[in-house]
Amino acid sequence: MRMTDIQRCEVRPGLLVEWSLDPAAVRAATGLPDDSRPPAYIQESHIRTARSVREGGLFVPTWLGTAFDIPGRVDLDALQEALRGWMLRHETLRSGFRWAGDDMRRFTLDAADVSLRRETIGEFRDADVLVRYLQDRFDVVADALRWPNFLYTAVVREDGASVYMAFDHSNVDAYSVQRIPAEIHELYAAGARGIRPEREPAGSYVDFCRTERTSADEVDGTDAVVERWREFIDRCDGRLPNFPVDLGLKPGGRLPRQKLMREMLVDAEDAAAFEAYCRPFGGSLVGVLAATSLIVHEIGGRPVYRTVVPFHTRRNSRWLESVGWYVGGAPVEIHTARAPDFDSLLRTVSTQLRANRSLARMPLARVLRLLGSDFRPTSPDLYSIVSFVDARGIPGSERWTELKAYGLLRVSYGDQVCAWVTRLHEGLQFASRYPDTDVAHKNLRLYVERLREVIVSVARSQQPGGSSGRASSAQITLP
């Protein structure tokens, strides 16, 4: 679905209703014994980072969410039961953490104790006022350092309702939130007809956390994966990679506010042609990374583009429907200055991804611990990313535009560029959080315009009238 923020997801006035975990369930959780299943390394890193940044005097909301419509007069009882039924499928949403000294201990609420409290907040006639209220509420409730850390809302009108749901990132990734609209619609439609659908619980992310952590803890500092990360970080001057263009930031300065840039890059026709061109090398991800390496070389002049590429870790079908944070990262180095043409860049990226993708299975937080690296976080983002996701296969994706379905990002503070390129049925969409400086805006604007130009040039090089069946230096100028 299209990635955006709460300000740009077509919020309309109406009656606001909220659902939160019932206070009785919250009280029950306080007396629960420890759950022996540990946090995933990525969860622990996220929560410790939030604590470190908070202790530094800055509150940095980092929640994710989704927005979508339910057409027609809405049955709030059926919607509440749909939300509860969906939540019961995903164990991580009733599992949280508490501190025991400096250790994180998990607790998990029994499914039988899960209930939601509905509260009618009131009528909002001004969309801007409603947006500010929703953002403020999500900031407070969907917070890494509290539990429960999610909130469900609906803005009800005569002709339907808009649902807005927010979660701390420790429980969800982009794929998780993209699956939500279809699941809620299915459960709601059944409930509105008086049918209680029998759906088995999805694979538990809490179980995955234990499995992944057990495997990661068997690795020591002599492992080849750790050594490859060591070499990569050494070539990054002892740091994880930033987006290699000038962002107008002063060394040691305060964490800057961020802005959002989001737009469609190309339509479905050009997206399909770009994908077809890149398919022999591995597909659109390879093409986007190759184009990025070319563009940042043009802007920043660096001969090598180093980045950490996000990959999902749902390698077993058991986890395909599961809500959780199933993401790892693989180090990639692209020697842009050595490439005589775009095809050479594609081959370089393809080779790098094949060689390094398996490294994403090892949690980076575990690697850093084994390296003895003191990455005391001062920013919610340890490194910059350029992510690519093909979302067309997600259930319900063909209705996302009709249902005004969006994936929501909280844009607050950060010194990194985090960019997402999403393949939708209607084309390629770009969204990015970036530091709010004039220099960063200028350079990111230049990056996006050049990314569009490269994609279009590649796509149209093989269309009738194109000068060549392959994109070479005749179509795309390499420095």
Predicted features, each with a name:
Residues 1-55, 81-124, 202-258, 477-478:
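Short amphipathic alpha-helices and their capping loops
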Residues 24-31, 36, 58-78, 144-165, ...:
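Gly/Ser/Thr-rich phosphate-binding loops and adjoining beta-strand/alpha-helix segments
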Residues 34-52, 128-133, 177-178, 257-273, ...:
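AMP-binding/adenylate-forming domain of the ANL superfamily
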Residues 76-87, 135-138, 181, 275, ...:
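Short amphipathic alpha-helical segments
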